[in-house]
Amino acid sequence: LTELIGGAPSLGLNARFRFYRYQPGDFFKTHTDGSWPGSAVVNGKLQADAFGDRWSQLTILLLLSGDYEGGHTRFYPEGESGEAIPVHTPLGSALCFPHGGHPQHYPPAGEKVRQGIKYIIRTDVLYGRTPESEKIQRRWMY
């Protein structure tokens, strides 16, 4: 992982884990993963902005199944009209990539699952906030 983004240090994983299940015919259209403040569990409840000093900059996908066909993650370096780069992630692997306003963000998409069921977990790598990292956030948010 990148130790610094915009001069801000990595501070760990977001406590907000999202679980996804893709069945045959399911897909995820081209999109931009959002950049979010760090979450934490406080008194048994998820608090969305628990710290005030960190934002996510990288997506992490954890692959929990391998007995499916299709469902590759595709990245579009030149936008949706350009050529896609397909990435097959086998069972037990992790895929990490920049999101939000990060200058190296390439919009991802999830190919249609043809057979079987694809299970993944998504979370984020959190980074501190600096004037440079704030510029990265503003490019995405506004």
Where are these regions (language model features)?
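Fe(II)/2-oxoglutarate oxygenase catalytic core
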Residues: 1-94, 101-142
